[in-house]
Amino acid sequence: MLAVSCFRVTLSLRKEQAMPEYKAPGVYIEEIGAFAPPIVGVATAVAVFVGHTEIASQAGHAVTLVPTRIDSPKDYSAIFGGAHAARFKVQPVIASEADFTAGGAGYALSSETTFNLYDSIRLFYANGGGTCYVVSAGSYADDPAQRAAALQAGLAAVHDLTGPTMLVIPEATLLELNDYRLLRQAMLTQCADKQDRVAILDVIGTDRSFPSADLRTVETYLHDRIADFRDGLAAAPETLKFGMAYAPFLKTSLVDVGDFSFANFDSDSKETVTALLASEIDRLYPARDPNAQSLKNDLRDVWDAKPPTRTVLGQKLVAQIPLLSGIFAAMAAKRGTLPPSPAIAGIYTQNDNSRGVWKAPANIGLSAVTAPTLPINDAMQDDLNVPLDGLVVNTIRSFMNRGTLVWGARTLDGNSSEWRYVSVRRTLIYVEQSVALALEPIVFEPNVAQTWARVTAMIENFLQGLWRQGGLMGPTPKDAFYVKCGLGVTMTAQDLLDGRLIVEIGLAPVRPAEFIVLRIGQHMQGA
């Protein structure tokens, strides 16, 4: 027997539609529809992003905390501006934690204030994203201490918005762990309350790379970050089927080295950077080489020069000192390391448009991505995909000759056979919302057998179309779904008195072939 998911739709019919009133004698013609009106499927891939922006102005009006529709990165830039100009501090660290090396020593780049919504939108569109909504939670100049509250306010602003099917807040990963957990739970709670959207979550802390570390170090680090993520999730089990988590972060090719200059160094790092570059000049050029002194003079002047002169001096130094180019490349890599949720939202959109919402959004290559930050293997993924507590984290992995792939298709409710898969959860939302929207004109119709038959025919036609497209399991429509509506079937006499029309729908959604097992044996030919 096929696994069937079932839900009920209840309409309140409290007034009967008035019959036409005829006064003059004569013949009147009333045309009656021979067929039930078709149900048009709702959009399945409309993301809503919340985060901080450079500006928030549309047609001269401020749109902070206002959900604003965009259709391209160009639309985003026109309304919300560009990227945040991060200022990096350069500090010596051990080699395993270094972003770059100089003179045999390791150095790390850190920035007290960072924002990632601008680059996240670019990653979303690079992976097939389409129409979406953006909510500016504030500007880059806002008090960093209020960031968590601002993101919560941005999330609240989309609660009553009709249309979005995916919640994405990449900047959640920039919060303190406790603030992150509160925002994550607020996202899941909103999804469970509205039942028309899902939350795509990132695992905080998986942005770190270990270039020279062994797999055991990576495994230990990943295990700790996953434990941090799962802590507290089980407190609201009814929300888990509306959430999907992905890890690790992604190294992208969106940010160019040319986007960085001396303006991106923190003022506290001036002496450190000057000393490093001066030593590099001494290493590259003989002591009496006139080039050496010229470069040192430029290095001295570039810090206080005005923008046009600073740009010229900076370009000259980059061309002559490979170390400086390497530092700017490290800055680009730092800013270009992004949480996976925007790319996943783009993949959902691309997958829905090309295959259908019922196809698992997995085993799909990511664009503008060079690699995941952590090299996850099969052994590491075992506990992520089938954990004892059911709190699944889908992975993004690199495969030889195949690139970086989304390698997981489960919700956080991994122990539920009914809501385990992303595609099943989203297919049910698609059916529920499409049917609910189509039945709105039925409200106030007479609650009689003719109306029940009309409603049943509408829904059956819709589900038969879904079955023909491959969205439902079963060799025949009867095996794939059923629709029930009637007195003594889904309604009692009291339901009729209370004005309720209740429809019961059962369907068998397709589930992904997650584990493909090949059984191969040798056949010995008889003598």
Language-model regions, residue ranges each:
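Structured, hydrophobic secondary-structure cores that serve as assembly/anchoring elements
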Residues: 6-7, 13-131, 153, 159-173, ...
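Short linear interaction motifs
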Residues: 28-30, 135-154
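Generic recognition of short, well-ordered alpha-helical segments
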Residues: 146, 178-182
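Extracytoplasmic, non-cytosolic globular domains
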Residues: 184-188
